[in-house]
Amino acid sequence: MINGAHIIVYSKDAEADKAFIKNVLKFKYVDVHEGWLIFKLPPSEVAVHPSDDNDRHDFYLMTDDLDAEMAGLKRAGAVCEDVSQQAWGRVTRIKLPGGGTLGLYEPRHERP
C-alpha cells in the first residue's frame, strides 16, 4: 500500500533553499544525516494533465487564501511573481534563493 509521496526539489543553492523552506515556509523537518533535511508537507493531491511532454512534473503548494499567504511570505522576505488566473485557480510562483521557483495556488476546484 502506498502511504505517502516524496518530492525532490533540485537547487543550485540547496543550503539557501533548505533554509528558506525551514525559516520562511516554516515546514517541520527531520535531519536524517549531516544536514540532509526532509520536510513534512501538508496533505496533497495528484492531478494528471494531457501533454506531449511525458517527463514533466510540477510541484505546487496550495492555500485557501492566496493574497494572505503572499502577504505573509513577502513580510518574511520572499518574492512572489504576479498572480495569474487559471481555470483551476489563482496562481503565483515563489522565487527560491537557489534560483528556482515553487508554485503556489488557491484552487477553485473541489479538493478530495
Please provide the spans of the model-predicted regions.
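N-terminal beta-strand motif that seeds the catalytic metal site of vicinal oxygen chelate
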Residues: 1-18, 45, 57-59, 108-112
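Vicinal oxygen chelate
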Residues: 4-12, 40, 51-112
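Conserved active-site tyrosine of GNAT-family acetyltransferases
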Residues: 17-22, 73, 99
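Short secondary-structure junctions
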Residues: 25-32, 78-83
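Conserved short beta-strand elements that form part of the metal-binding/catalytic scaffold
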Residues: 27-57, 61, 101-108
